[in-house]
């Protein structure tokens, strides 16, 4: 089984979402002997710029060396997503949405003709057959509430790319709920993996 883990928290040593991702991969590692994990930090992710847009709009066979260089990081990120059976996206909610670094990662992997394509019936996602776990933490925003713009957007954009099997596990309102938010989320991780294990085992 090939897992792509994307960490978006600005915190490194005291991150709730990183701990949840660690737990998820620990449980998977106990069950999957040949588990392969690629870790990707969203921090420092390059933003789409004019050179990127021009290169991406150029036919691949017609791109010059500068254009290929402009898309090199994006190509690497796309390859990681395409190779993964399971995505683990660990993200806090900042100011009601996802961190800018995670949005930048999405912009780098949402590539026409690679991860989605336009058809006469509308856009079609090409990253089908994958499972995504979105591990979310927040200080005060309740996941699923009217002020949560992070998880609905992630579910939508993943579905747009063809990843429609998305599970959200939330340790939300941590400032109000304290340790109970983290404990409940950890238990949810274990329960979800137990439930999903038959399908995950088949994928592995």
Swiss-Prot record:
EC number(s) stated in the UniProt entry for this protein: 1.6.5.-, 1.7.1.17
Annotated cofactor note: Binds 1 FMN per subunit.
GO function terms (MF aspect): electron transfer activity; FMN binding; oxidoreductase activity, acting on NAD(P)H as acceptor; oxidoreductase activity, acting on NAD(P)H, quinone or similar compound as acceptor
This protein's record includes keyword Acetylation: no
Binding site for FMN: 9
Cofactor(s) listed: FMN
Catalysed reaction, written as an equation: 2 a quinone + NADH + H(+) = 2 a 1,4-benzosemiquinone + NAD(+); N,N-dimethyl-1,4-phenylenediamine + anthranilate + 2 NAD(+) = 2-(4-dimethylaminophenyl)diazenylbenzoate + 2 NADH + 2 H(+)
Keywords assigned: Flavoprotein, FMN, NAD, Oxidoreductase
Biological role: Quinone reductase that provides resistance to thiol-specific stress caused by electrophilic quinones.
Subunit architecture: Homodimer.
Record-stated family: Belongs to the azoreductase type 1 family.
Name of the protein in its database record: FMN-dependent NADH:quinone oxidoreductase
Species lineage: Bacteria, Pseudomonadati, Pseudomonadota, Betaproteobacteria, Nitrosomonadales
Gene: azoR
């Amino acid at each position: 089984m090939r897992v792509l883990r994307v960490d978006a928290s600005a915190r490194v040593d005291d991150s709730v979402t990183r701990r949840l991702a660690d737990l998820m991969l620990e449980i998977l590692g106990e069950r999957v002997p040949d588990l392969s994990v690629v870790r990707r930090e969203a921090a420092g992710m390059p933003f789409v710029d004019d050179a990127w847009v021009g290169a991406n709009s150029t036919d691949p066979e017609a791109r010059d060396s500068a254009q290929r260089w402009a898309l090199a990081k994006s190509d690497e990120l796309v390859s990681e997503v395409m190779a993964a059976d399971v995505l683990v996206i660990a993200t806090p909610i900042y100011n009601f949405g996802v961190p800018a670094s995670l949005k930048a990662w999405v912009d780098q992997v949402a590539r026409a003709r690679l991860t989605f394509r336009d058809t006469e019936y509308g856009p079609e996602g090409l990253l089908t057959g994958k499972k995504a776990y979105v591990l979310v933490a927040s200080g005060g925003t309740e996941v699923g509430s009217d002020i949560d713009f992070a998880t609905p957007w992630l579910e939508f954009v993943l579905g747009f790319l063809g990843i429609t099997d998305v599970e959200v596990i939330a340790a939300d309102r941590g400032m109000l709920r304290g340790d109970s938010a983290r404990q409940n989320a950890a238990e949810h991780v274990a329960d979800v993996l137990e439930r999903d294990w038959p399908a995950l085992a088949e994928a592995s």
